[in-house]
Amino acid sequence: MDKKLHFVSPETGPNSNLDLTPQLAQSSSAFLFEPKNIVPFETALGWQKNFQKNLIEQPFSPQAVWLLEHFSCFTMGRGSDKKNLLFEENNSPLPVFSIERGGEVTHHMPGQIVGYLVLNLSLHKKDLSWYLRELEQVLIDVLDLLGMEGKRVDGLTGVWCEDKKVGSIGIGCKRWVTQHGFSLNVDCDLIGFEKIIPCGLDKVKVGKLSDWIPGIKVCDVTPLLRESVKRRFKLNWEK
């Protein structure tokens, strides 16, 4: 990416006319899943598909949120450019999954929190741009609680700290029921990002929270994400 990134604060930039406070008229229910063990990517994808199918068929059934970690892998969104893989497809260093979300190639690994949200936007707001900004705000709010300033970049999706991208967003949506969500780098090994052009952004710098807060762990951040998701989308966790 040759041009200089134009950072914007959460309240400014091209989306400054958006109300970034939760938009639900009333709360709705969701199951919360926080697996203790690392989850294979294809397993979590199956969970999401099942819940999405059920929500499409039964729109007022509980939604679902997962906060988890994955084994190391790469995922590619709809229409991803294979030129962003810096290796031969038949000689991949890690599993590669092509999935139905927006965005380019990204990398998942232990030490990164992945948030998957299967929400019925008919109960929230039927606006994908709004939804993307809300997911960004979930991460920005958590960073604020940690004493860090999360930033957006003009024309891009995700969250940066200083000049490093720490949070990625990628969603899928079918009949206004969402899939996929966000990832936040906490204390992960970032070496896998050297094998790709992350999110299709040439020369982008990738960071993790432990660059600023040494010793921080996933278990420190997960409760903050849980509450941020709950507050932003006005969710009641199902027992």
Curated annotation (Swiss-Prot):
Keyword set includes Membrane: no
EC number, UniProt record: 2.3.1.181
Sorted UniProt keywords: Acyltransferase, Cytoplasm, Transferase
Residue ranges occupied by any BPL/LPL catalytic domain in the UniProt entry: 59-239
Enzyme class name: transferase
Residues at the site labelled Lowers pKa of active site Cys: 165
InterPro entries: aa-tRNA-synth_II/BPL/LPL, BPL_LPL_catalytic, Octanoyltransferase, Octanoyltransferase_CS
Disulfide cysteine pairs (residue numbers): none
Catalytic activity: octanoyl-[ACP] + L-lysyl-[protein] = N(6)-octanoyl-L-lysyl-[protein] + holo-[ACP] + H(+)
GO process terms (BP): protein modification process
Ligand binding (substrate): 101-108, 168-170, 181-183
SUPFAM superfamilies on file: Class II aaRS and biotin synthetases (SSF55681)
Subcellular location, record wording: Cytoplasm
Main location: cytoplasm
Biochemical pathway: Protein modification; protein lipoylation via endogenous pathway; protein N(6)-(lipoyl)lysine from octanoyl-[acyl-carrier-protein]: step 1/2
Molecular-function annotations in GO: lipoyl(octanoyl) transferase activity
Cellular compartments per GO CC: cytoplasm
Positions annotated as active site in the UniProt record: 199
Homology family: Belongs to the LipB family.
PANTHER family, per database record: LIPOYLTRANSFERASE 2, MITOCHONDRIAL-RELATED, OCTANOYLTRANSFERASE
Functional summary from the UniProt entry: Catalyzes the transfer of endogenously produced octanoic acid from octanoyl-acyl-carrier-protein onto the lipoyl domains of lipoate-dependent enzymes. Lipoyl-ACP can also act as a substrate although octanoyl-ACP is likely to be the physiological substrate.
Further information: In the reaction, the free carboxyl group of octanoic acid is attached via an amide linkage to the epsilon-amino group of a specific lysine residue of lipoyl domains of lipoate-dependent enzymes.
Name this protein carries in UniProt: Octanoyltransferase
